[in-house]
């Protein structure tokens, strides 16, 4: 398992399943004879969009707090580019 990388991503609750489906389809989450392996926990993220940002949630200049999941999974090094591309396509944030 030395060729495995760990991916950690924060996802709004509304897009949790879509993001996981995308990264799993691209090759993440396989450990031995198991697939779709991940660890997740619900928390609260916060941010303030600065001028020039196009926030998915909230408005520029306002502090936002949103329910987000921290998702951790593993992926083979060879799948890194595909998993990152799938993550960017499925994730709603800029």
Provide a role label for each language-model segment.
Residues 1-94:
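Hydrophobic structural segments
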């Amino acid at each position: 398992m030395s060729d495995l990388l760990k991916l950690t991503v924060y996802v709004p609750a509304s897009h949790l399943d879509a993001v996981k489906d995308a990264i799993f389809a691209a090759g993440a989450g396989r450990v031995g004879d198991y697939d779709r392996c991940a660890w997740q926990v619900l928390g609260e993220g916060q941010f303030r969009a600065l001028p020039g940002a196009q926030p998915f949630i909230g408005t520029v200049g306002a502090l936002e707090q949103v329910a987000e999941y921290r998702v951790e999974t593993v992926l083979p090094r060879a799948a890194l580019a595909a998993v990152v591309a799938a993550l960017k396509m499925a994730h709603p944030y800029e």
